Amino acid sequence: MRSSIGARRALFDCQSMLAIIGGSGLTRLSTLAVAHREVVRTPYGEPSSALLFGQISGRDVVFLARHGHGHTIPPHRVNYRANLWALKNRGVGTILAVASVGGIAPAYRPGDLVLPHQLLDYTSGRETTFFDGSDRVVIHVDFTEPYSLALRVHCLAAATAGGIPLRDGGVYAAVSGPRLETAAEIDRLERDGATMVGMTGMPEAALARELGVDYAAIAVVVNQAAGRGASAHAISMASIAEVLETAMDQVRALIDQVVERVP
């Protein structure tokens, strides 16, 4: 066990690659010239999908489909630890994640892209840390700012350069899912300060921090949250699918711009 830990740490010494974690609506990157794919075995089981290695604009990029390539894994069953460990183990030092959210803030509209700066965690029943007492000394990582400021700056610059509307800042409330929320639950989240609600933001962000990986997320508003606006009485899954299909064009364009700017 000790020798495997040493080898693992050696692999983690040099991290330079950029990874994209695709969520609902983003199961592939059309501009990624895939060189090879690899199913990585981890101490935490198998990741959600094979890692796709390739290049975008001459830059090495890895892609992972959070819900599997057929979108078969619900948010509460995603193996977040395996996903993050696999990426780190293969040389990833920066992760840009994409996730769909419900808009709580009145200004948010379906199709908006938001770059959250804070989060609230309401999830339960998930493996939330690598420091589980099995073979690693516990480290209490600082999580004051859950998203990488440097990566957020690159995302904002990329959006400006590409003429892509991107809202700067927001508070992501992570819930367990897979069901959507009640109107009363959204009322509570709003009182707590949340501006959007999603199901995959945690423990993904915290695990990235534990591994020393820069992490930021692009949140795609796919509907107004329960009890709000067009979702006052019910949420239309057909409408969500339509929004995702349209919004992903902008997401892909933004990713291409970010790839050109991340060191």
Language model region names:
Residues 112-117, 214-217, 233-236:
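Short, hinge-like loop/turn segments at secondary-structure boundaries
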Residues 12-144:
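Metabolite-binding pocket within alpha/beta catalytic cores that recognizes anionic/polar moieties
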Residues 226-263:
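His/Asp/Glu-rich mid-to-C-terminal helical/loop segments that flank catalytic regions of hydrolases
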